[in-house]
A protein has these predicted regions:
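Conserved acidic catalytic loop of the alpha/beta-hydrolase fold
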Residues: 1-13
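Gly/Ala-rich beta-loop-alpha elbow adjacent to hydrolase catalytic centers
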Residues: 17-21, 25
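Flexible "cap/lid" loop of the alpha/beta hydrolase fold
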Residues: 30-31, 38-70, 133
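Conserved alpha/beta-hydrolase catalytic His-Asp/Glu region
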Residues: 50-52, 56, 72-140
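Acidic catalytic loop of the alpha/beta-hydrolase fold
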Residues: 126-127, 151-156, 181
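Short alpha-helix in the alpha/beta-hydrolase fold that links the catalytic acid
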Residues: 133-135, 143, 157-166
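Short beta-strand/loop motif that positions the catalytic acidic residue
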Residues: 141, 147-149, 153
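Catalytic active-site module of serine/aspartate enzymes centered on a nucleophile-bearing elbow/loop
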Residues: 169-206
């Protein structure tokens, strides 16, 4: 809200939240519905409690105090698939980020101590596992919404989509075949097309 007020944005805004960002924009929209024109999710966290996954195990370990100090070094790579670097899951999209570009971005962000700390702090203090109540409340509000998810997501299992559709009946959705959690930069043509269509549709309905 502070940023919106500072920028003197009077019209309603369109929000997009990816992974951890899903519950974050969802909470904002839920608390400030008069400021939001649409809320759009990309493989949002929040239903991970419904299923045991590798990421759940890593996140729960962070609740053990003496482990936090040591796991903070490797936490980002664990969340990105359990490797020391990120590898694109597919090369079929000609508009994808190249592997070299991705490696460069990954190495750069890992140089910042605050990056790792922020991820660890978010995992420890923000409920990534279960934000179902928030999604249920948001689903009762008349806010345009959409979600895109990969059916092979290894970080945030795509079966969360069924729960999300139940809690948010009017949400527009797209399930991308064989797409994993890196769909934003591995399959940007699909994600970009879906989001642009949703935002255009929501804007025309204003």
């Amino acid at each position: 809200m502070e940023l919106i007020d500072y920028l003197k944005i009077e019209q309603k805004v369109h929000l997009i939240g990816y992974s951890m960002g899903g519950p974050i924009v969802g909470h904002f929209a839920n608390e400030n519905p008069n400021k939001v024109e649409s809320v759009n999710f990309i493989a949002p966290a929040g239903y991970m409690f419904k299923r045991k996954s590798q990421s759940n195990v890593y996140l729960k370990i962070l609740n053990v105090p003496f482990i936090t100090k040591y796991i903070s070094v490797v936490f980002p790579s664990l969340m990105y698939g359990g490797n020391s670097s990120i590898k694109l899951s597919t090369d079929e999209d000609e508009n994808r980020l190249s592997q070299n570009e991705l490696n460069a971005v990954y190495r750069k962000q890992m140089k910042y101590e605050g990056f790792t700390r922020s991820l660890v702090s978010t995992a420890k203090n923000f409920n990534l596992f279960n934000t179902q109540k928030m999604f249920q409340e948001l689903g009762k509000k008349n806010i345009n919404s959409s979600v895109i998810w990969g059916d092979a997501d290894e970080v945030v299992p795509s079966d969360g989509l069924n729960y999300l559709k139940s809690d948010y009946p009017n949400i527009n959705y797209k399930l991308v075949k064989n797409a994993r959690h890196d769909l934003t930069y591995a399959l940007p043509s699909i994600v970009g097309k879906f989001l642009s269509e949703q935002l255009l549709s929501f804007s025309n309905n204003e």
